[in-house]
Amino acid sequence: YIKDDLRTSGDAVGVDAGLIWKYAQDSRLKPSLGLSIMNIGDLNFDRAGKIPQTVNVGVSINPTISMFRSLIVGLDYIDVFNNFKQDKDMAKRLRYGAELQLFDIWPVELALRAGMYESSPTLGADLRLLFITASYAMYTEEVGAYAGQDKIKRQLLTLNIGW
């Protein structure tokens, strides 16, 4: 006899807030700092449990490189105060990466991305031709208690039509 314990449900309303500060002075690196607070005051689903408030911080640079359209390099630290208390592994909460937009000349645009998410590599690309954009992303999701324990590889392929 198997009993299903996943039948508990609940309702809650979440509120998030965030700030981005961009360095206003003329700078070759064009740095930015970010802060987000998610699930302000926690999300309480009564018997179904709660999702705690989290604070995230990030920093990025967007240097000018003459041979490319743009380059963005960023670093985020998720759940600064470890409110989820799932583990003490800082590597699972550190995310960093870069996006290189090779060109954006109508009707073609090409961007490449690479980084690290939960201590595993990520890759991605966007190709736009006229009004159609094809996007690919590959990343690994951590489901274990510490970085590297139990990983699931995921791939996404999307096709968008827009103008």
Task: Please provide the spans of the model-predicted regions.
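Outer-membrane beta-barrel porins/channels
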Residues: 1-163
